[in-house]
């Protein structure tokens, strides 16, 4: 079910998730972990129009958990933390039906 996802940035994870295809509509797991649910402060959905790019975002103290149940999205990550072992590392991670999972 998908592509290999190699991540170079320390602290970033790709957690493979399951999806169940059904002719009536597919089912996508997002999480079964109690600690994931307990720590949620905000949940929102976003769309990206085909061929468009959404702006770079810089988060200093935020952990995001991203899932792409419809379509395919390429996330480009850069480690700008000067005190990080992976300082200046860059990752391109593609998430979608062929590589379904949660990016943390």
Predicted region positions:
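Short, intrinsically disordered, charge-balanced linker/junction segments flanking boundaries
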Residues: 100-104
């Amino acid at each position: 079910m998908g592509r290999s996802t190699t991540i170079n940035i320390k602290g970033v994870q790709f957690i493979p998730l399951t999806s169940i295809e059904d002719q009536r509509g597919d089912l996508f797991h997002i999480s079964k972990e109690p600690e994931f649910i307990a720590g949620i402060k905000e949940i929102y959905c976003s769309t990206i129009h085909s061929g468009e790019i959404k702006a770079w975002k810089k988060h200093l103290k935020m952990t995001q958990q991203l899932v792409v149940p419809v379509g395919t999205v390429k996330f480009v990550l850069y480690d700008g933390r000067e005190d990080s072992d992976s300082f200046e590392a860059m990752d391109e991670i593609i998430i979608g039906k062929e590589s379904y999972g949660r990016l943390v």
